[in-house]
């Protein structure tokens, strides 16, 4: 009898890659809001008027606002909310960066752990990660640069719709067109402007509220800058905690997380929280590895000891609930009225709820079998492989082609009733998402992979080991 080899189980962090892929879809969905509004408004262009229009004059927007409670249902809210997804991205980055450190510290005696050994083990990853993120962020601005200079992209599209004055609570991300740079007279001036924006990627210690923080050719890169800044803070904290016991580390980190949230920081507390989750997950990971090595237990039947999956499912549900907290008028959301009454936004801002939810999701998802299988599925893994590329390329494509695509789809299907509206929406969404995936696949193959190889080679050539 021929025995087929047993399939290799997914790695202990494969679900993290799948989760990143799912989060990339959520970010894509979040940036569709103004696209849908302008695409719908194109179907009945407004008459020229000297006074600015209210965004609520658009029937689709007015209908959505009148039915706002439907869009605040937990889980449904997560499907199109960028803030919780960004928070979870930051927590994941801190988790992945710290997991290697936690494994190293658990296997290395304190007496033999020296700063030199730590820098030798982790210096390469810090160098490669920082350089790789910078190079890819700069490369992602090339296509928007061409679109702006050739005149294909028009940053005044919102003004041409008459929406020149937007109330802060009613912007629906329509102001993001203004974040792009103006078209310069010559190619040389435009190239110099691009160079200045590339330099912004490196200046990670500028305050996020400053105009110079976000590179204008790809405004989503503000998260990359925040990620780089938090990763440097995390690396310093790793070194500072070398001689600290595990329990004391967790206490110090918890204090850092609380203080960071209290002063309004976003990325650093989430990175430190990711480290805490890595510290908590590591013992269970070691038990699982020992079980897999045991001859008495086949690999595919390995059981996971640890907290009750039902309890973790409850924690996951609570995390999703907190992450779904509305940023606009939470008092009008039926399922959040009690929470908002007990803890007003003045005490705990919406983004803090998103951070707490992200931490709970990262902590619990690993031990919820159904959620983990979804993240380890082939589709999620494919999206995870291309998640960074999707994040980098989707924004300029969505705002450049999205409004016209949705207008075309609704022109074909109609938009007078819910059925025809949904058909047109589905067609436009599918075409746009496939286009973004194709662009991301090309970016991953022809930009991301070569950049990774270039960074690896540069590190090998620059390493002190070459001088020995």
From Swiss-Prot:
Keywords: Acyltransferase, Membrane, Transferase, Transmembrane, Transmembrane helix. GO terms for molecular function: acyltransferase activity, transferring groups other than amino-acyl groups. It is an enzyme of class 2 (transferase). Its EC number is 2.3.1.-. InterPro entries: Acyl_transf_3_dom, Acyltransferase_3. Pathway: Secondary metabolite biosynthesis. This is Acyltransferase R4. Pfam families: Acyl_transf_3. One of its GO terms (cellular component) is membrane. The chain crosses the membrane at residues 21-41, 70-90, 133-153, 252-272, 308-328, 388-408, 423-443. It is a multi-pass membrane protein. It is found in: Membrane. The keyword Calcium does not apply. It comes from the Eukaryota. It comes from Phoma sp. (strain ATCC 20986 / MF5453).
């Amino acid at each position: 009898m021929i025995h087929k080899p047993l399939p290799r189980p997914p790695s202990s962090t494969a679900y993290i890659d799948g989760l990143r892929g799912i989060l990339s879809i959520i970010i894509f969905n979040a940036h569709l809001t103004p696209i849908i509004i302008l695409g719908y408004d194109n179907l009945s262009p407004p008459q020229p008027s000297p006074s600015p229009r209210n965004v609520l004059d658009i029937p689709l927007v007015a209908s959505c606002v009148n039915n706002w409670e439907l869009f605040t249902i937990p889980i449904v809210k997560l499907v199109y909310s960028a803030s919780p997804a960004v928070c979870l991205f930051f927590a994941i980055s801190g988790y992945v960066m710290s997991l290697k450190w936690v494994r190293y510290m658990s296997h290395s005696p304190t007496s033999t752990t020296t700063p030199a050994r730590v820098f030798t083990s982790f210096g390469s990853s810090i160098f490669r990660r920082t350089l790789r993120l910078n190079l890819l962020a700069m490369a992602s601005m090339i296509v928007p640069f061409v679109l702006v200079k050739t005149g294909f992209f028009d940053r005044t599209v919102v003004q041409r719709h008459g929406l020149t004055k937007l109330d802060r609570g009613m912007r629906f991300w329509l102001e993001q067109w203004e974040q792009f740079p103006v078209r310069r007279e010559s190619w040389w001036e435009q190239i110099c402007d691009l160079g200045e924006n590339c330099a912004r990627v490196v200046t990670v210690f500028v305050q996020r509220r400053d105009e110079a923080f976000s590179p204008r050719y790809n405004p989503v890169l503000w998260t990359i800058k925040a990620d780089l800044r938090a990763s440097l803070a995390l690396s310093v904290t790793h070194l500072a905690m070398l001689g600290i016991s595990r329990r004391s580390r967790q206490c110090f980190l918890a204090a850092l997380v609380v203080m960071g949230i209290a002063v309004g920081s976003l990325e650093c507390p989430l990175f430190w929280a990711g480290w805490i989750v890595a510290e908590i997950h590591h013992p269970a990971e070691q038990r699982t590895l020992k079980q897999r090595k045991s001859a008495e237990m086949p690999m595919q039947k390995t059981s996971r000891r640890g907290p009750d999956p039902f309890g973790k499912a409850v924690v996951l549900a609570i995390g999703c609930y907190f992450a779904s907290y509305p940023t606009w008028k939470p008092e009008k959301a039926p399922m959040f009225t009690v929470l908002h009454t007990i803890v007003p936004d003045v005490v705990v801002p919406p983004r803090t709820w998103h951070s707490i939810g992200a931490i709970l999701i990262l902590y619990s998802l690993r031990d919820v079998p159904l959620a983990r299988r979804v993240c380890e599925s082939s589709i999620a893994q494919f999206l995870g492989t291309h998640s960074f590329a999707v994040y980098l390329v989707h924004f300029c494509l969505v705002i450049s082609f999205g409004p016209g695509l949705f207008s075309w789809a609704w022109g074909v299907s109609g938009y007078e009733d819910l059925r025809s509206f949904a058909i047109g929406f589905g067609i436009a969404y599918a075409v746009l998402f496939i286009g973004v995936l194709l662009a991301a696949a090309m970016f991953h193959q022809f930009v991301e992979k070569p950049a990774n190889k270039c960074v690896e080679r540069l590190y090998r050539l620059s390493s002190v080991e070459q001088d020995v």
